[in-house]
Amino acid sequence: MSFFRRKKLPSAIKPGVTFGRLLIKRVDSDGLTMLAGHLAYVSLLSLVPLVTVVFALFAAFPMFSDISVQLKSFIFSNFMPAAGNVIQSYLEQFVANSNKMTAVGTCGLIVTALLLISSVDSVLNTIWRSKNKRPIVFSFAVYWMVLTLGPLLVGASMAISSYLLSLNWLAQSGVNSLVDQVLRIFPLILSWISFWLLYCIVPTVRVPPKDALIGALVAGVLFELGKKGFALYITMFPSYQLIYGVLAVIPILFLWVYWSWCIVLLGAEITVTIGEYRDYRQQKAEQQAQPPEGQL
């Protein structure tokens, strides 16, 4: 019957449908959920070493002594919803215990923390299907720079923000209210910039900055929405607490880390698909511009 015949899509939604098909094809081909599971496992293995190294860096700089407390609160309240307080208390105990380790054990912690950065590098290059390899020395330098300079830059930005908020002339001029509004969306801005840098710098192929900006924005928005949705799910449907009791924090943390990596990798897939869609449109335009064979 004519009702069941395939209808032509409206021209206004054709680009979106085509882009969606390309994206779904890439996500299925790359095995996004499997890659996210791999990164979630490595993240849980590297979590304590990574936190230990980061806060050891803050301890080495007295200027960051007050900022480290603010940074802990910011990370656990904005990036680990619902169970953030419980996870924070456990991690602080683990970090305190790691301070008693020998030099060999400390080197092991650093290597484990670098393992996470190396895994992220490998997975993103898998998504970009890049076969280019960086020299080992250069890769180690990049990983070490991310591990050391990244936390210090975040700490410096928070120190500057705290200093500006403490100035009297800002409070009198009414700029404080504007700064408060900016600070409310600061987690989204920070996620957006972080994802953009991740998509631009880590792949060993050239990534158009505009494409990475769009993919990072989608990932940042999904991350914020996912954070609120996950916190709502944990509070409204406390099945994990009922089943696991005190140990509920373990599956909750694993589920959140896995969901976070799914969002990050989806942003990477969107970034790649934007370039593929551009090439698809260009090839289609070239085919339409060529005259039929009978008219040659």
From Swiss-Prot:
> How is the protein disposed in the membrane?
Multi-pass membrane protein
Q: Give UniProt keywords alphabetically.
A: Cell inner membrane, Cell membrane, Membrane, Transmembrane, Transmembrane helix
Pfam hit, one: Virul_fac_BrkB
Its transmembrane ranges are 44-64, 67-87, 104-124, 136-156, 185-205, 212-232, 246-266
Q: Where in the cell is it found?
A: Cell inner membrane
> Do you know which InterPro entries this protein is assigned to?
UPF0761_bac, Virul_fac_BrkB
- Output the Gene Ontology cellular-component terms: plasma membrane
Whether Cell inner membrane counts among this entry's keywords is yes
As for family, the record states: Belongs to the UPF0761 family.
Q: Which PANTHER family match?
A: INNER MEMBRANE PROTEIN YHJD, UPF0761 MEMBRANE PROTEIN YIHY
Q: Sorted alphabetically, which HAMAP family does this protein's record hold?
A: UPF0761
Question: What is the name listed in the Swiss-Prot or TrEMBL entry for this protein?
Answer: UPF0761 membrane protein Spro_4878
